[in-house]
Amino acid sequence: DVVMTQTPASVSEPVGGTVTIKCQASQSIYSGLAWYQZKPGQPPKLLIYKASTLASGVSSRFKGSGSGTEFTLTISDLECADAATYFCZGSTYGGGYFGGGTEVVVKG
């Protein structure tokens, strides 16, 4: 199995700020990394797949980077609507493996 270590567990930044979330895989997953946004009572929303490809309709304020074992999600120009929990998912032929999540608090 692949262990996905996601940091930080929570982060608080003001509107207009920038948040960086890191995800480390216990073994190489090449570019098999996706990022999701989850809000209470709503299904997870795919933000980025293949490490850096923006999903349809997602703001370009969200940027994914990395390959192998080290990946990063950067959210720039934060908006109140970005307050949510963010998860990484590493995919291999053996299945999908999720990070522990990062709660993003946006201070208005």
Curated annotation (Swiss-Prot):
Residues 50-56 are annotated as: Complementarity-determining-2. Residues 24-34 are annotated as: Complementarity-determining-1. Pfam families: V-set. Residues 35-49 are annotated as: Framework-2. Residues 1-23 are annotated as: Framework-1. This is Ig kappa chain V region BS-1. Keywords: Adaptive immunity, Disulfide bond, Immunity, Immunoglobulin. It comes from Oryctolagus cuniculus. Residues 89-97 are annotated as: Complementarity-determining-3.
